[in-house]
Amino acid sequence: MDDYRRIADRIAADITGGRLRPGQRLPPQRAFARRHGIAPSTAGRVYAELVRRGLVVGEVGRGTFVRATAPDGQPGIALTEAAGAPLVNLELNYPAVPGQSELLAPALAPLLRPDALGEALRPAAAAGTPAARAAVSALLARGGLPAAPERIVFTGNARQAIAATLAALVRPGGRVGVEPLTYPLVKEIAARLGLALVPLATDAEGPVPQAVADAHRSAPLSALYLQPALHNPTSLTTSAGRLRQLADCVHRLGIPVVEDRIWAFLDPGGTPPLAALAPGLVHLVDSLSKRVAPGLTVGFAVVPRDRVKAVARAVRSGGWSAGAFALEAAVRWLGDGTVDRLVAAKRQDARRRQRLVAGKLAGFTVRSDPAAYFAWWELPAPWRADTFTAAARAHGIAVTPGTAFCVGPGRTPDAVRLGLGSAPEPQLARALQTLAGVARDGAAAGTG
């Protein structure tokens, strides 16, 4: 083995063993060369090898830093440092409010009777149960989408509903138009299904219809995947006028749409679903995970009538069916008002957390919405997303770098997403204060 690779192996072992921590700066290459008794050119090859392995990131004029995640990890997944210290989790977004378990428990008690439990443990089909279809249909109607129960297809969660609808709509090799910043797991779903994601220009009102038409003219788009309500990560809600333009555009071009509205429940005054404007083309995806709890959830898609069988087949073949127990619990929570009470509490909770962001990150460029559970922080120069993520992790805080959301080539944004829903409120306040200090110190020193 070449000498530089042996040295790289030793540094890699220090990183994976926790002796070199995320965010820690490696010495300049000349200093590294002197310390190891090697030529500067060999030190350069060591650093290049560490970059190739995904263990460090180099910033011209700033230095080389240990990355925030392992090379085979996905940004936004790890919850503990290598050394075992818990992180303040501003990556994953699992909002819970005080007293949530006490609200949920009463509806589950009757399911513990042997007769009820036996029914709830039976296999569930993609069509769910009549009671589940009726309950979700009523929920959707309150959100501005009258949906016939027979158009509803159930899955285990929203990710599975997205995967099933895309699998039903797009053949391997097909092109799917998306916002240039999109839900990271859609990138994984597309890779697994063999789909090509095509970034579409957006502006302050949402996706640009002309960008859809131009991309479709270049090579036909098989579908669009859009987040018109509280877009993740930017919190943008597409304007009502732009939604009408998009509906006209997809009607004219005949492009089906997967509309992700998983966060729309937080903003009752927001725009209506795109599916209400183009019901023959739009497949609306939603879930109870954010409204209720991520551990016992139900996802669903409202599908055009002529696509119901195809989406149901995709659910079966993917093994993405909802559990009967979760369906029965959902019916009870929707019927007794539990979901409505949790939604009201989470709307208030999200607004309190956004006020913390506004206060602790005052003076920075932060894109968000008062109703959202996340914020998109455009970092001050000279910070880069990867190095800031590593520096945050070195301070015990996990954030998601902008690269996790980017689609297509081009310069990635120097931004991070802050997930506000998982950390307890006092912990969130302290974490935001710490991050503000890290950002200011790095910007002042010019060492981002």
Residue ranges and their predicted role:
Residues V57-G58, A147, V399:
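Short beta-strand "wing" residues that participate in macromolecule-binding interfaces
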